[in-house]
């Protein structure tokens, strides 16, 4: 069940769902707007010949911090990682989905490539997969609205919420844009 503004405020008010910092003005009829942080991960395309999800490639990206009053310029065709300014914490019976803002999509900015789902139990900043599919550069300002979180109540609490396993979860507690950790517990089924 998708939570309404009333339900979102109740979940935040009770402390079950946390957004830090929280601004009530960001609450929409069935979502909460989230803002862009000032940290970005740029891809160093000359460090590796290919990207291999099975391998640890620690020099694939580098962290860039922009001043709070300066924009990050995302050029046409570029892909960078960003993150929400807000830290999100979800209980074991609420999941969330990050969606882009329509106004930014109409300018050619894609907020996430594939990873818009946030598991129950997650805590941390949400990493954004930012792409410019327009023909002009796009200015990304720290603190600007970048997306919206929709919250869903599960039919029952998750048996193993994110971060509860013995091995932990790859992105639990992440701060800022976090590079891929696909190589950790990489799974590949033998296909004949």
Swiss-Prot record:
Task: List where Polar residues composition bias occurs.
Answer: 171-181
InterPro entries referenced in this protein's UniProt entry, alphabetically: dCTP_deaminase, dUTPase-like_sf, dUTPase_trimeric
Q: Say if the entry is tagged with keyword Nucleotide-binding.
A: yes
Q: Name the UniProt key words of this record, in alphabetical order.
A: Hydrolase, Nucleotide metabolism, Nucleotide-binding
Site (Important for bifunctional activity) residue list? 116-117
Biological process terms from the Gene Ontology for this record are:
dUMP biosynthetic process; dUTP biosynthetic process; nucleobase-containing small molecule interconversion
NCBIfam families in the cross-refs = dCTP_deam
Name of the protein this chain belongs to: dCTP deaminase, dUMP-forming
> Which organism does this sequence originate in?
Beutenbergia cavernae (strain ATCC BAA-8 / DSM 12333 / CCUG 43141 / JCM 11478 / NBRC 16432 / NCIMB 13614 / HKI 0122)
Q: What is the lineage of its organism?
A: Bacteria, Bacillati, Actinomycetota, Actinomycetes, Micrococcales
